[in-house]
Amino acid sequence: MRLHSAITLRNLFTRKSLRIPQNLSITASPLLIGDVSGQIKPSSTSHYSKSSLSEASSSSSSSLIFQIPNNASFFLENQRRYSTGSSSGSPPDVNKVVDEINLKFAEAREEIEMAMDAKETVYFNEEAECARDAVAEVLEMFQGLLGKVTEKEKASLQRSMGLKIEQLKAELEQLNE
């Protein structure tokens, strides 16, 4: 291992100085093995798991400990938060509701399509009622969201989702004819 690589590793993972023996044979594992049964357990509750790198020769018993990021928790904590341009603390809630509305929108369109396919059958009334309920749920969720957000967010939501909502209303009208 070159010296500048060791410095890079020190700065990236441990922020501590490293002792590197001259004749090093490395065996690395991202997790420590807990017992003889083979169960693998993380070494601590921190965001990093320890991996020991030990020398294969029996002449020296020195070992190195590097901290390697535990990818799952490291990713979740450093995940970007996307917002709708608001400076308030509600963007994750708004995004969650928008995702739910989009999901319900897709379900409502499927219900309308199934009702249109059953137009001249005995199942039409049931399918049409399910489609009306699904559209009503989407419209209720969208209006509820518009009532909870600021004017700036409301305008943004109208621009991004208004056309889809109008499309849903038009498809429902077409079903009712």
Curated annotation (Swiss-Prot):
Main location: nucleus
GO biological process assignments: response to cold; response to salt stress; transcription initiation-coupled chromatin remodeling
Residue runs in coiled coils: 98-118
Keyword vocabulary terms for this entry: Activator, Coiled coil, Nucleus, Transcription, Transcription regulation
Superkingdom per UniProt: Eukaryota
CC terms in the record's Gene Ontology section: cytosol; mitochondrion; nucleus
Annotated compartments: Nucleus
Induction of the gene: Induced by cold and salt. Probably repressed by HAG1/GCN5.
InterPro entries xrefs: H3-Acetyl_Activator (IPR053325)
Tissue and organ distribution: Expressed in flowers, leaves, stems and siliques.
Role this protein plays: Activates gene expression by recruiting HAG1/GCN5 and triggering subsequent histone H3 acetylation of target genes promoters.
Self-association and partners: Interacts with HAG1/GCN5.
Name the record gives this protein: Embryogenesis-like protein
Protein species of origin: Arabidopsis thaliana (Mouse-ear cress)
